[in-house]
Amino acid sequence: MSQAEAITDTGEIESVSGPVVTATGLDAQMNDVVYVGDEGLMGEVIEIEGDVTTIQVYEETSGIGPGQPVDNTGEPLTVDLGPGMLDSIYDGVQRPLDVLEDEMGAFLDRGVDAPGIDLDTDWEFEPTVEAGDEVAAGDVVGTVDETVSIEHKVLVPPRSDGGEVVAVESGTFTVDDTVVELDTGEEIQMHQEWPVRRQRPTVDKQTPTEPLVSGQRILDGLFPIAKGGTAAIPGPFGSGKTVTQQSLAKFADADIVVYIGCGERGNEMTEVIEDFPELPDPQTGNPLMARTTLIANTSNMPVAARESCIYTGITIAEYYRDMGYDVALMADSTSRWAEAMREISSRLEEMPGEEGYPAYLAARLSEFYERAGYFENFNGTEGSISVIGAVSPPGGDFSEPVTQNTLRIVKTFWALDSDLAERRHFPAINWDESYSLYKDQLDPWFTDNVVDDWAEQRQWAVDILDEESELEEIVQLVGKDALPEDQQLTLEVARYIREAWLQQNALHDVDRYCPPEKTYAILSGIKTLHEESFEALDAGVPVEEITSIDAAPRLNRLGTTPDDEHEAEVAEIKQQITEQLRELY
Amino acid sequence: MKEYQTITEVSGPLVYVETDEPIGYDEIVEIETPNGDVKRGQVLESSDGFVAIQVFEGTEGVGKDASVRFLGETLKMPVTEDLLGRVLDGSGNPIDGGPDIVPDDRVDIVGEAINPHAREYPEEFIQTGVSGIDGMNTLVRGQKLPIFSGSGLPHSDLALQIARQASVPEEEAETDDDDEGSEFAVVFGAMGITAEEANEFMDDFERTGALERSVVFMNLADDPAVERTVTPRMALTTAEYLAFEKDYHVLVILTDMTNYCEALRQIGAAREEVPGRRGYPGYMYTDLAQLYERAGRIEGKEGSVTQIPILTMPGDDDTHPIPDLTGYITEGQIMMNRDLNSQGVTPPVNVLPSLSRLMDDGIGEGLTRADHGDVSDQLYAAYAEGEELRDLVNIVGREALSERDNRYLDFADRFEAEFIDQGFKTNRDIEETLDLGWELLSMFPKTELNRVDEDLIEDHYVEDVADEATAD
């Protein structure tokens, strides 16, 4: 959170009810940041009616009462942008949690403010412009090695008029030192600010054509998301939303990851804080934390800050996109965000829409997801923001407003299923209900970069799975043995697709990340089993004999086969399956 | 302190008072009725010249002539190590006839959120001695793992069994080396339970000597409903004090959260708030989170707070807002099952919908045993398959099923009879639980065990069981 410069006006508290405070005598505009009460609790103006200003407060309001002062900063909620955001953990209004811990111990006290980036750290600034160069808004004027993985680009602020560079510094500076000066008198620092509720400008939004490779077989293989795409993961509790989100944060081939824990569990965020510095990024081999920013507003932290954490996160994502990076943003969970809106709205006694949610729920959701995309930046680079939002529908019922309004916007839908989770089939993504609308525009990439018949083989798998779900209905009535032999065989093949391919163990050192080549190879092994089995059946071999060959169960172990051995292993299994089956006739 | 006799409205648990000085939000209030009764309450809404007060002990006898005192502070819990062994009412006053409590400190009961950066990730296995939990849904220190139950199911017995048997295996080995610091304590918060249930708990605590290391908060069914919103906060404040100031490992049992949520709904309705699902307030998620999130470990502190809240699902429906919101906050759930209960399986834990989110980091080599994760996965998969086949058997009969399917059916029966049904008195250590798991898994040929690492199969597979199964 950026620090306010000055107090523009002071009013007085009129009433307090939970996170909602009203003040009188305050000259303020919508979304101005104010400091409430003697302790100076941060809040934001959300309604103005006559002389009464309504404020949502980002901290606990116990003990605050009428008559106490309210100070207006005259500025909207703004984040600090600059080197030092990666490898950090923030609360919902971008206060660094490690700094807060130093200042007030293990429990979060009130009224403490801290800048989002450390203002005293020295950074090595390497200019990329020289005196006499013309620069415009968004142009890169220099670079800083922010972490081992990421080179931070210092940009001319988006609202700048640009101009000719008259002075350039090089060397070690803090973020507030001027590093470049323009002939207009404008001074450029590494530190910038941006109001969170406003999208950062770009030149153009383009159609994404490259996948965000997730390393998850069911996602890359069946329901891929594009770099710059949007996805929703709805599911009842216990179905693995958070594990899926975390797997994506760990293994997706994005340059930058912004992980928002919105109204979720404290221990989960701690797990991320402990794991990410240890785990290597599969692309660079550096610690994952070097490309990650965490925003943690756990369920017991103030509800108004839960409303703002989504905006804080996406603004940080946009800033890295402006540098030309591919950013992946995970929001876990957008339902908690919607509930925070509902809670504030009900305290304001607004007319409720569906299930008590405010009528502007759909608008807020679409505004947020529209900040994702594949963009052309002002400095000529291309960057993307992929947004993956978890949804926690009450009772696992997808017909509720948050899921439905999300589905109207996002183009990838990964439906989590409690039945699969109960059987410990993870990731518990239901292949019948899920979809990706990016498939067609991403297929050329897979064809060029992985293998020619990527799309054909996927279609084969989808057909088998479809056939299985139709047959399962019959099996439920008459039992498997009553089916014709060819259908029994199809069920057997489908079982391998489910168990050897769709299932993936997020906790296994090898299996947790599966490169697209391996995703393809495992499935091709099962396809060989399919083809050879049907050959054997046509030649008159009974189905029991076909299904009892001992090479087939080895397919189940392929997920845990190391990446550099899988090719040989798949080839060997294919060969054995072929041999063993052909021996039967 | 100023006294007011300006009550303008009394409505259910709420009292509205006119004031001429500013009153702080959440501040504590004393209301004295003309006959001398003193009731406590809390400011729910504070406007200029006007406050809404929620009265804990019920508004009986409160009229326009009652006098109202604002104490100028928020609700505090007097805490001290001497609370161990004491029985208190739902507002924290002793009811065991013992001496007055001399507090070391008075702590705000709302509690502050633990900074996620200061938390330590829970990964210390707690052995409860219950196979369905230890083997399949492992509890770890600092976790919040509720029991989802239904009316008439023996959730109290299970909670007591856990409180009695819970131990950390490593520590047993080096018991006396450990300084007194990391002792085990139980904080028990009862909300709206019947006197009979309360007696059951108290008898068990006294019989097993557990009372000495317990603090008991009792809000019974006939105590004021509004007090129930305070009881768990009192209990958790005490637990946090014992854990983070006095280095205890505290197990907090809260029963019954359903009564707590009913009290929330009652207050919401009295305040004429816009209701959320099924009439429960829209902020119930946040409110419950403020309780459940008070479990955990903190870096640099010895103690820990582990929570086992119990809730009865209305109509055994886990999509009801109370279990639903709870499940979204807690780190898993232990599900009690009515069918298993009527079959006489004790504890009637249905492992399929049960879950412990923190299990994976608390088990494995060096923590429990290297094969733990794989065994549990395989048991789950096999039991789920067997359970699914049961539906089919009802239609087509066993004969129509393949040998493989029949084996899964047998497994599901034996899993319930041998693994789950252990009784409330049996205390199985983790080795026993896992060995039993292997015995059951060995009903299958090795190739069926696709969730288990091949080396582990070699180490643990029980050969003769498989022979028997095929001989049948």
UniProtKB/Swiss-Prot annotation, chain A:
One of the entry's Gene Ontology molecular-function terms is: proton-transporting ATP synthase activity, rotational mechanism
Cellular localisation: Cell membrane
Q: Which InterPro entries match?
A: ATP-synt_VA_C, ATP-synth_a_Xtn, ATP_synth_asu-like_sf, ATP_synth_asu_arc, ATPase_a/bsu_AS, ATPase_F1/V1/A1_a/bsu_N, ATPase_F1/V1/A1_a/bsu_N_sf, ATPase_F1/V1/A1_a/bsu_nucl-bd
Catalyzes what? Answer: ATP + H2O + 4 H(+)(in) = ADP + phosphate + 5 H(+)(out)
Give the E.C. number(s).
7.1.2.2
Topologically, how does it sit relative to the membrane?
Peripheral membrane protein
Q: Record-annotated residues binding ATP? A: G235, P236, F237, G238, S239, G240, K241, T242
What keywords are assigned to this protein?
Answer: ATP synthesis, ATP-binding, Cell membrane, Hydrogen ion transport, Ion transport, Membrane, Nucleotide-binding, Translocase, Transport
**Where would one find the signal peptide in this protein?**
none
- Its Gene Ontology biological processes? proton motive force-driven plasma membrane ATP synthesis; proton transmembrane transport
Q: What is its main location?
A: membrane
Which proteins does it associate with, and in what oligomeric form? Has multiple subunits with at least A(3), B(3), C, D, E, F, H, I and proteolipid K(x).
State its role.
Answer: Component of the A-type ATP synthase that produces ATP from ADP in the presence of a proton gradient across the membrane. The A chain is the catalytic subunit.
Name of this protein: A-type ATP synthase subunit A
Q: Give the organism, scientific name.
A: Halobacterium salinarum (strain ATCC 700922 / JCM 11081 / NRC-1)
